[in-house]
């Protein structure tokens, strides 16, 4: 898989969207009503996209070592989650998620249960997900990806 600006952009957008879907489904089920977990009312959770790109760029060489890949993905995603939680709390003066009730948590920002999940999801994305995603994107007709032509506004003075 070739990582370039386009492929990293695809990984970022798709994983941001899939993260939003997962977060929204879980929050909706737990709350009993629709809960949009996206950023700025859009269908994206940017931490998932950012972490997806980080893992793709950093750990592609570990594809032949799945155990090391798992622990690398787990650590990187957990650090990203902790940093994001701290930044969001500092910027918005509220905790966006709280794992204080879970075993083996660090200040309620991260916990072992989700770190293991991030490790498994990160490993799956690096081993298979990114390749499948980019193969699917390669099936999109080129004309759909071309930017629309920009025509200058008609001049009021001739």
PLM segments and residue spans:
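Aromatic-rich, lipid-facing transmembrane alpha helices and their immediate juxtamembrane interface loops
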Residues: 1-158
């Amino acid at each position: 898989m070739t990582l370039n600006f386009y492929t990293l952009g695809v990984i970022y957008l798709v994983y941001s969207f899939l993260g939003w879907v997962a977060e929204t489904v879980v929050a909706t089920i737990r709350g009993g009503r629709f809960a949009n977990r996206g950023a700025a009312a859009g269908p994206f959770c940017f931490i998932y996209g950012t972490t997806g790109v980080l893992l793709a760029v950093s750990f592609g060489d570990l594809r032949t070592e799945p155990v090391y890949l798992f622990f690398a993905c787990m650590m990187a995603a957990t650090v990203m989650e902790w940093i994001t939680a701290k930044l969001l709390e500092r910027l918005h003066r509220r905790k966006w998620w709280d794992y204080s009730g879970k075993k083996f948590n660090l200040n309620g920002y991260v916990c072992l249960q989700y770190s293991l999940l991030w490790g498994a999801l990160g490993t799956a994305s690096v081993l298979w997900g990114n390749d499948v995603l980019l193969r699917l994107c390669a099936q999109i007709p080129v004309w759909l990806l071309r930017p629309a032509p920009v025509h200058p506004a008609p001049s009021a003075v001739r």
